[in-house]
Amino acid sequence: MHYVVFVRTDDTPDSDLGHYLANVGATIESHGGRLLAFGAPTRLEGAVEYTKTAILEFPSEAEARGWYDSPGYQELVASRVAAMGKPVDVNLLGGLAV
């Protein structure tokens, strides 16, 4: 079973998120995760509330939660919130057989 984390956010210039973007990949990989997709979503139906979406895959719920709760990632969350002025929407979807 695989677990997917969806991160949705409003547009913030990448220059404001330099520290976060330079370091987040290592925190994902250290928990067995990988980035599946990142960018501006294309609306097929409904209203798009976010301008950027990231989709991450982890091999287990424990790895996904371990990544999110890790001190290394939480330090990056603090820098991201400081740069953006608000938190983002992060959701875990589990039990995907691939």
Residue ranges and their predicted role:
Residues M1-K52, P59-D69, L93-V98:
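Short S/T/G/P-rich N-terminal loop/turn motif that feeds into the first structured element of a domain
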Residues H2-Y3, Y73, P87-D89:
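Proteins with a high burden of low-complexity, intrinsically disordered sequence enriched in S/T/G/P/A and R
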Residues E57-F58, V88:
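Alpha-helical membrane-embedding segments
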Residues R65, Q74-K86:
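C-terminal structural segments of small proteins and small subunits
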Residues V81-V98:
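C-terminal end-helix/capping segment
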